[in-house]
Curated annotation (Swiss-Prot):
The encoding gene: MPH1
Catalysed reactions listed for this entry: ATP + H2O = ADP + phosphate + H(+)
Binding site for ATP: L344, P345, T346, G347, L348, G349, K350, T351
InterPro entries, sorted: FANCM/Mph1-like_ID (IPR039686), FANCM_DEXDc (IPR044749), Helicase/UvrB_N (IPR006935), Helicase_ATP-bd (IPR014001), Helicase_C-like (IPR001650), P-loop_NTPase (IPR027417)
SMART domains: DEXDc, HELICc
Domain spans labelled Helicase ATP-binding: 331-499
Locus of motif DEAH box: 447-450
GO biological process, alphabetically ordered: double-strand break repair via synthesis-dependent strand annealing; interstrand cross-link repair
Domain Helicase C-terminal: 675-846
Protein known as: ATP-dependent DNA helicase MPH1
UniProt organism field: Coccidioides immitis (strain RS)
Amino acid sequence: MADDGCSGLSDFITDDELFNEVTLNEVSDSQTGRPTKRRRLNSHEINTDSTGRREIEEAGTDSDTFDPSLPPNSKTTGRGRKSNDDNPAARKPKTYTPKYHVDQKPLFVTQTQPSSSPSRIRGPRWKAPERNKPSTVSKAKQKSPLPAIWGRKPSTIGSHGTNGKDIDAAIAASLRSFEEEQSARGDAEMLDDSIEEPGDTQVHATPGPVTNAEKETIFDFEDIPDDAFDFEPEFTETADKEPILISSQPRPSQNTTRRPTASQSTSFRQTTLLGGFASSSSKRSSQPATQTWPSSSRNEPPTHHELNKDALRTWIFPKNLGSRREYQFNIAHRALFHNLLVALPTGLGKTFIAATVMLNWFHWTKDAQIVFVAPTKPLVSQQVDACFHIAGIPRSQTTLLTGNTPPGVRAEEWRSKRVFFMTPQTIMNDLKTGIADPKRIVLLVVDEAHRATGAYAYVEIVKFLQRFNNSFRVLALTATPGATVEAVQEVIDGLSISRIEIRTEKSLDIRGFVHQRNVETITFENSRDMITSMELFAKALQPVVDRLRNQNAYWGRDPMALTPFGLTKARQEWNSSPAGRAASWPVKGTINSMFTVLASLAHAIDLLKYHGIGPFYRNLVSFEDSVLKEKKGGKCASQIVADGNFKVLMSKLRSWTNTEEFIGHPKLEYLRRAILNHFLDAGGKNGGDSEGSDSNTRVMIFSHFRDSAEEIVRVLRKHQPFVRPHVFVGQANAKGSEGMDQKTQLEVVGKFKTGTYNTIVATSIGEEGLDIGEVDLIICYDGHSSPIRMLQRMGRTGRKRAGNIILLLSKGKEEESYSKAKDSYEKMQQLIASGSRFTFHTDKSSRIVPQDIQPEAEEKMIEIPIENSQLGLPEPAKRSRAPKRPPKKFHMPDGVEKGFTKASRLGRTNTDSNGRSKRKRVVRTPSPELEEFPDLGDLCANQSQELADDPDFQEIAGKQIPRLRMDVYPEHQRSLRPTGFIEHGKYTRRVVKTFRKISKLGFDCEAQYRAIVGDPDDDGEGLEGLSTDREDDPQSVTAHQSREQPPRVEKRCGTEELSSLDIEAFFPNLAWPARPEAPRPESDGTDNRDQKPSQRKKRYMISDDSDVFE
């Protein structure tokens, strides 16, 4: 038990003398130069008849949950300890005198000092330790003699002189306290001299000291657990060049499943560098270390995509760019089987990884579709180039669709192509209208994935696809996943991410591909002109701020501390406060107007502080014009403009900005000198006209606002052609500034790469993902509190060669914001790598590939098809007339019952609740085919003959039916008889009209006919001169007869030809009554032959509704 004794007292030794065998020098009070160390012991600690429980407890313990390894309560130790009047022995001090001599300096210890937190050593405080159940090893130790201390024999323990018994009791109590602490934590005891045989669980105590040879062979390596040396240090602040351990880097434990051995025990535990004990139950990474893919216990339904079994045997890694990079190889392999979020610094090949994954899924499936989405068209075009010239995806199978493509053309492309490069809004519209089939999509690649928060189109696309398709892969690419834990978790939830692969510039596997970037931070004080402007502007705004303070709506006093966000929050709080709710409408309107005016002017304050006098002056000019000319802002704005301080300020600003050489901010002067020095150091003297000039070096400047970007360009243009700057902004038009469409943006980027421009001043449009080219110097004109934007800016340089970054910050808020962004980025990288704060969606990440298939990597050169050498993007050709938009199509998820379902059948499957099967649908027998129709002429002739010969047609019930006669009831034939429900038809009216005309014909109709038409035997000579008048009234006929010119024959049609027939021959039985002639209308003597048909008077107009006859 000698070894156990050393282990038991090892906690009393400091860190710098751990496990050193020492002996205390036997010195007396007269030999030492300092007083002896005194230790005060309670009476119950040295009581010989005390049980093991009382010996463990220190004096003054409050409860049973007190940990004996911790320092005692302050009320019971030291000077503040209360005395026990009932036990006078407790007041008597005990002197501890060392008896053993050592070569080292004497060491005096009074109590154990654990290096870890109490909850980590003894467990939670609400759980009392199980002290009544000592382990078997503890009992064996109690029966064995006390171990040798510092190499001495056990017999020497009792030789302490006068106080020997007290010292022995104190040491024994300390040993038992340590043993009880170990058993209370449930951990195994420290190593003793017992050797455990395989399969034997009994402890064999071997008394006596342990030699050094025995110590070397005492370990049984089979008893060491697999994770004994899987130590993962906590993240601490490291130097810039110190690597950061990340969870996604390969570890042996992540590729194999741990299998415990037969003799595995808990006799060993891992010690941290700080002296504590590592906790094996803590969650170490976002990816479980013991899980292999695919999981044998996870049963997934087979995919509905048609897979290519031959191609699934391998997965292709292109070598067109040269030697492979291990991090790209590992990330691409994991992206084939997981919904992966890839976080890589800019310029490290995220586009190549996406092209590799797209190529493999293109070969693995036969007709499934692959979609790549990016927020802007320039980002989409970058991926198109990688897929064509690196992955070798055929151009004929790809297309680029944006909102400018007509829906009819997009529908045709969705039916014929397999690889699509789109903007997120376009694909979302195609999915909603049914143009795109969500069930055919097998891979969705998302660029700039940090945007996938809230209701952005990325999130809506994934949600829509999951409604119809449970077998598709998601690959998300970004350089900065998020600024907070909540933002990263929102991205994980929105895209159903199951794994994260993250790398930083300090990661071991990418250090060889990241060039050094020197970051230089420069801070600036406000200039005299800026201070003067701030003072005048503050005096102009002070009355408005005081009015808000008097209304308890705003608590700030300094107008220069106004911010748009602060004013917005103050307005919301005042409106929701009792004072705001109880205020009258005029008061509310006045206060809200003041908040609005101050919020607009707070932006001008930011421009003055961080961007200079020029942008500040232009903002105030716009504000002044809106008040004086457009009459906006109300009384509050008019009061500010009319203030004397404001007028003095505008006068000074106007005089300063009219000076050509005026520079409104110290940042701008430093920026100008830094750019000139950079080009001079690069060897350029003639602006790139000679060899060795600055034609190979580029500078990029980032500014948050367009006003400051244009101010920078104005200053730099004075040094042309040495410095050739150009502004680079977004598409939207701003007040006083025009936007740049995507075509213009690509042209500017192309000229920047070729050297036409060597300096670009960009807003946020140049931050995300755009391949600007090789930039040697990055200047951030203003700091930003967002780590995403900060890292996007810095990632523009240091890709193929070393780069420099200059940060221009104003002292105060801007400097603090940058520091906060930097710390937030580093902390987020650690949290993402650990994965301990995120929840991943492994249940929504199906493998798609069958579990019995394990594709093997195949590295090879990809043969690029000849069709990929064509210039331009694979956009559909423009047509003179676009195809019609197809009707909206509703896609249904699998297993959905289509059609109408009764309420009684809801929730039922093939059988009802009683076990009865559904009623089978009645199948109707097909009706016999119809015979061909006979010829209509033959049919009519046969029917007429049959009716004439059929006696049944003429007789009903033995009575003969008279034949139809047209000569009876003539009065009824010339009138429309009353009807009940159905009106008279068109043909009925015509027949009645015809009979009316016939009835009006007199007995002299033949003579009248001959007079008008002429002799029927005439050969038609002289017909050219006949009249073509269509009037039929007798007066008109008489007028024509009186003319000397020969009459003209007028062709008549219809029933009017009946006037020349002999009516009596047709109706011999009719008695024709003598009818008086109708009065003829007097002629006005005008000739109607030249009138238009619509202007002529119509004769014989019969009302169809008239039933009255003469």
